Amino acid sequence: MLVRPLEPGDYPAVAAVFAEGIATGQATFETAVPSWEEWDAAHLRTHRFVAELDGEVAGWCAVVPYSRREVYRGVGEESVYVAESAQRRGVGRALLEAVIESARAGGLWTLQAGIFPDNGASLELHRSLGFREVGVRERIGRLNGAWRDVVLLELRL
């Protein structure tokens, strides 16, 4: 497995993995994959990675700023997505470890993750890398007409 910085040319594969996550209904409130321009503008350029298996993008991890307020400049929210065909092969762990290292080296002091309670694999992965649950945001948003809760986890760097 190769984990490397995400490049613009990776986006079609990143978008395909993202689309798989959207289709599960357990990964995100998003209902459509954003354009490269939208995705690029939202994510911090120094904290985005892809993992390759056999030369193909098998997953990605990236960080968005938690807030535009200066007081929170060192807090990021990370997302990690793994292709269905690559799950349970260490891809998510390798990606999340890369983002944690990058965030720490880049001066961030906290990473957050918001995960649906039913996404046991993601909760397990995050907890295994030191993220701790700080609460449940009840009925925080609607997905396909239904209110959803989100488990909020964070890691102090």
Stretch-by-stretch model annotation:
Residues 62-65, 112-116, 127, 132-149:
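Conserved catalytic-core motifs of GNAT/GCN5-like acyltransferases
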Residues 11, 15-41:
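Conserved GNAT-fold acetyl-CoA-binding loop/helix
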Residues 31-85, 96-97, 102, 156-157:
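Acetyl-CoA-dependent GNAT
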Residues 87, 113-123:
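Conserved beta-strand-loop-alpha-helix junction that forms the acyl-donor binding cleft
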Residues 1-9:
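Conserved N-terminal entry element of GNAT/NAT acetyltransferase domains
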Residues 88-101, 123-128:
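Conserved acetyl-CoA-binding loop-helix of GNAT-fold acetyltransferases
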Residues 1, 56-60, 148:
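Glycine-rich phosphate/pyrophosphate-binding loop shared by adenosine-nucleotide-utilizing enzymes
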Residues 103-115:
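Conserved GNAT acetyl-CoA-binding A-motif
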